Amino acid sequence: MAHSIWHEKIKSFLPEHYYGRINHFLDEAYASGLVYPQRENVFKALQVTPLEETKVLILGQDPYHGPKQAQGLSFSVPEEISAPPSLINILKELADDIGPRDHHDLSTWASQGVLLLNACLTVPAGQANGHAGLIWEPFTDAVIKVLNEKDSPVVFILWGAYARKKKAFITNPKHHIIESPHPSPLSSYRGFFGSKPFSRTNAILEKEGMTGVDWLK
């Protein structure tokens, strides 16, 4: 399901048998209609970014709900798929902040310790937030609580009102929070553009004696 260390830590913040409830939910959801991402990618964020390597969290809300977009990493799409509007704006801010990145699959961020997590890990095709409030929030809140317990600093990048509510779980003074409006077209001009989250994250990591992220990779 997830990287084994993640699994053990997350379980400590969940009611007994919650993983069984998740599996039952997934069985029913994927049997009853088209759901994104593909089932093998539901926990991809936790599979490709081990807990011990995680130094940044970028929190999304739920997966893209269009064909072939969602790949289990927040905001990322496969290279052959056109970038959705929020990702276009993320890459625009990255270009203004650090430099241009000519591809929009963010897997290389995940392999550098950037946990690309959605608060809701599945979505019915064509229905944004269609699985919100059903099963996922206690699980992904537990992920944030696990990160909060880390001894090494983590930079939490929270875009938009929904993500910013999760600050309540970030109580460890070792960690850092970068927050701004969401990169969606509706809010990007209200403070997302110009917020420089990428250079700010690297400045924090380097000040903490950690390696910055190669955001252009």
Swiss-Prot record:
Its EC number is 3.2.2.27. InterPro entries: UDG_fam1, Ura-DNA_Glyclase_AS, Uracil-DNA_glycosylase-like, Uracil-DNA_glycosylase-like_sf. GO terms for biological process: base-excision repair, AP site formation via deaminated base removal. Transmembrane segments: none annotated. One of its GO terms (cellular component) is cytoplasm. Keywords: Cytoplasm, DNA damage, DNA repair, Hydrolase. Excises uracil residues from the DNA which can arise as a result of misincorporation of dUMP residues by DNA polymerase or due to deamination of cytosine. This is Uracil-DNA glycosylase. It comes from Streptococcus pyogenes serotype M3 (strain ATCC BAA-595 / MGAS315). The lineage of its organism: Bacteria, Bacillati, Bacillota, Bacilli, Lactobacillales.
